[in-house]
Swiss-Prot record:
Protein name (Swiss-Prot/TrEMBL): Forkhead box protein L2
Organism the protein comes from: Mus musculus
Gene behind this protein: Foxl2
UniProt region (Disordered), positions on chain: 1-50, 272-341
Subcellular compartments: Nucleus
Keyword Transcription attributed: yes
Amino acid sequence: MMASYPEPEDTAGTLLAPESGRAVKEAEASPPSPGKGGGTTPEKPDPAQKPPYSYVALIAMAIRESAEKRLTLSGIYQYIIAKFPFYEKNKKGWQNSIRHNLSLNECFIKVPREGGGERKGNYWTLDPACEDMFEKGNYRRRRRMKRPFRPPPAHFQPGKGLFGSGGAAGGCGVPGAGADGYGYLAPPKYLQSGFLNNSWPLPQPPSPMPYASCQMAAAAAAAAAAAAAAGPGSPGAAAVVKGLAGPAASYGPYSRVQSMALPPGVVNSYNGLGGPPAAPPPPPPPPHPHPHPHAHHLHAAAAPPPAPPHHGAAAPPPGQLSPASPATAAPPAPAPTSAPGLQFACARQPELAMMHCSYWDHDSKTGALHSRLDL
């Protein structure tokens, strides 16, 4: 009896049969992998879920994927809505954020339309310095970019004022008003008297010379020149000098005639002959007889004696001051034409405590010299 053995080929086929069936089942269960030629596209984002991109990334994405690398504001809106359906809702909120980022972010540049006309809206493009602000095209990771230097406007440059350098307005320097770092004029700082205590005395600065005093000094020079041309003995010269002494009392406790620089030809009451005084003159010496002559006696010798007092009043003795009332005061006599100077008398000024101008009368009987105040 002969035993039959299976051939080797049949045995190999029997052993491989279960493995091939198992591989077919695994191939049917596994999904097909996407190929290079005709693979499946990734699924669209969920409309209910907000995309994980910032507004700057959305704007940059829309501009980069455009054909001309620039878009209008409405074009940016349309791209975002078509790319991410989540933004179809609540358009007012996110569109305001898009406009806000376009205006304030320096990586977006506004480009006006060509030709202008009735078409509104400008183009927006990316700054060439900010092309690589996203790392390798990943819009979720943004690099920190250094802002490009842009000079400030001309009227806000530090160190320059609105009207010129140094805080001067219109070429005239304003004392106490300086320009700060951005060109604004700081108001002058004054010390208000309402916040001061009376028990704390503060030194007061000297008051500047008023504008009227400057005008009066110029008028005095012109009037003196006119008086010298008319002659020292003319009544108009005395009136001019008397008029100059009147308004000066309202600017200070002392008369301005004393401090004015009188030209030669006009005699001051304290220094005998004319000339600009370098310093305030000393008070007049007490009248007493002088055995020796002075320069101011030359033109005072021809003055008439004083008028007799009215109402029976006794005449004062020689060498003594006698106050004269406005009714009894004798008018000053004009000096002779040969005298070197011109006499004048101060007008009545009630607010002054004392008079700084006087004229000299010569007594022909006794020869004594005394002065009178014309109040």
